């Protein structure tokens, strides 16, 4: 018999210690990876519920198993809240991840070998937008577009490439681009050549939900997102559309199940429902505006200290620090900052002479620090410490000093108070 007082600490102390150590790491490290965030205890409560026991292949009202009357309620709540949040007429909350949501879109709209226009990974795109090591690059004919010398998307060049290659689908969205994307312009180009416009808004979904970044849903045929990152929900994916095209919706549903997945993760879908409800609250808008304010404050200090920011600034939650010309690789910067309890990720920058495993840049994002309460003053102070380390990355004394400052700041702003 299963008993409610069963726990990991007594049964599996080795695993429990790893979990405890990760909890401590999150409290004592400053998280600047742009794709990471802290989810709420309410979301974690949903994910730890008995919903994890339930198989529910199919969709609400059309399941292949019995006993789904309550998980139908859960999934319907998630669907309706997602639609409300983004102004969609269709939502599929079953994808296990953003990448699986993206693969479902490819499966629904394309055939292997079809031509796709996607943002170059080296210019800020994502693996699933056509990288040769990803399914998207292996199964489809990918034509990349990129950014100009100013670090902004070149829509004239995009249009020229689109007219020349006539892709069946154009992809908007990014994993490392700090500007505003003109979704309407992309739809205009797509319509000129009769292509689908697919937008992956994973990185900026929270900003979009709060109205501080343009919403692609009214412009794209289909939109995907993760539910973590700026949305601050559980790790997972979602597909949205406002195309009012029932045939398209059927294709998307079929591509998720049975096309790419079996049973949905009902405990995670419950977590998504909670996160969408949280994102509909007024304070979520305040949070997202602060995310952008903090990012702009950090850019200001980087520029003052002589560091180059790709595109010269940011209009969202992230920035790319360009280290080309400095005697410091992205990998070295990542490691040095990590030693001071500041977590970033090395990242390729445009025209990067180094490999993706070494890189000449670091990507920095503000969702997590804002979630724990940092405002502009703390963001600027932190950026100064980062610059101190980048200026002298091989100096243990500098790293140790900054680490002490980081620990003191983290103690003032606990993640879970």
UniProtKB/Swiss-Prot annotation:
SUPFAM superfamilies: PLP-dependent transferases. It is an enzyme of class 2 (transferase). The record marks 228 as: Plays an important role in substrate specificity. The keyword Cell division does not apply. Keywords: Amino-acid biosynthesis, Cytoplasm, One-carbon metabolism, Pyridoxal phosphate, Transferase. The keyword ATP-binding does not apply. The modification N6-(pyridoxal phosphate)lysine is found at residue 229. Its EC number is 2.1.2.1. Its main location: cytoplasm. (6S)-5,6,7,8-tetrahydrofolate binds at residues 121, 125-127, 355-357. PANTHER family: SERINE HYDROXYMETHYLTRANSFERASE (PTHR11680:SF50). Belongs to the SHMT family. Catalyzes the reversible interconversion of serine and glycine with tetrahydrofolate (THF) serving as the one-carbon carrier. This reaction serves as the major source of one-carbon groups required for the biosynthesis of purines, thymidylate, methionine, and other important biomolecules. Also exhibits THF-independent aldolase activity toward beta-hydroxyamino acids, producing glycine and aldehydes, via a retro-aldol mechanism. HAMAP family: SHMT. Homodimer. This is Serine hydroxymethyltransferase. It comes from Shewanella putrefaciens (strain CN-32 / ATCC BAA-453).
């Amino acid at each position: 018999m299963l008993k409610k007082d069963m726990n990991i600490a007594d049964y599996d102390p080795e695993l429990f210690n790893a979990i405890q150590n990760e909890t401590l790491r999150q409290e004592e490290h400053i998280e600047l990876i742009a794709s990471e965030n802290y989810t709420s205890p309410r979301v974690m409560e949903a994910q730890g519920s008995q919903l994890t026991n339930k198989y529910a292949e199919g969709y609400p009202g059309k399941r292949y198993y019995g006993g789904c009357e309550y998980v139908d309620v859960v999934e319907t709540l998630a669907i309706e809240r997602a639609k409300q949040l983004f102004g969609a007429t269709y939502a599929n909350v079953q994808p296990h991840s953003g990448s699986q949501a993206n693969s479902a879109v490819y499966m629904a709209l394309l055939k292997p070998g079809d031509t796709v226009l996607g943002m170059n990974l080296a210019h800020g795109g994502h693996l699933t937008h056509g990288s040769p090591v990803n399914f998207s690059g292996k199964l489809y004919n990918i034509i990349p577009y990129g950014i100009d010398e100013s670090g902004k998307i070149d829509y004239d060049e995009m249009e020229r490439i689109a007219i020349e290659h006539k892709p069946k689908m154009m992809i908007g969205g990014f994993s490392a681009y700090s500007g505003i994307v003109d979704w309407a312009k992309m739809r205009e180009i797509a319509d000129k050549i009769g292509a689908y416009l697919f937008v992956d808004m994973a990185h900026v979904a929270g900003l979009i939900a709060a109205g501080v970044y343009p919403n692609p849903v009214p412009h794209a045929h289909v939109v995907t997102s993760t539910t973590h990152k700026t949305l601050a929900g559980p790790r997972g994916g979602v597909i949205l559309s406002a195309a009012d095209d029932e045939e398209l919706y059927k294709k998307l549903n079929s591509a998720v199940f049975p096309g790419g997945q079996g049973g949905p993760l009902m405990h995670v879908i419950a977590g998504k429902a909670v996160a969408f409800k949280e994102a509909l609250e007024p304070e979520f808008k305040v949070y997202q505006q602060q995310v952008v304010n903090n990012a702009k404050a950090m850019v200001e200090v980087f520029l003052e200290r002589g560091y180059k920011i790709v595109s010269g600034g940011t209009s969202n939650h992230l920035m790319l620090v360009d280290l080309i010309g400095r005697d410091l690789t992205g990998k070295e910067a990542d490691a040095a900052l990590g030693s001071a309890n500041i977590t970033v990720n090395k990242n390729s920058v445009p025209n990067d002479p180094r490999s993706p495993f070494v890189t000449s840049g670091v990507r920095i994002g503000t969702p997590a620090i804002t979630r724990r309460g940092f405002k502009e003053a703390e963001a600027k102070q932190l950026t100064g410490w980062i610059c101190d380390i980048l200026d002298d990355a091989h100096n243990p004394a500098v790293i140790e000093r900054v680490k002490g400052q980081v620990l003191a700041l983290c103690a003032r702003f606990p993640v879970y108070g």
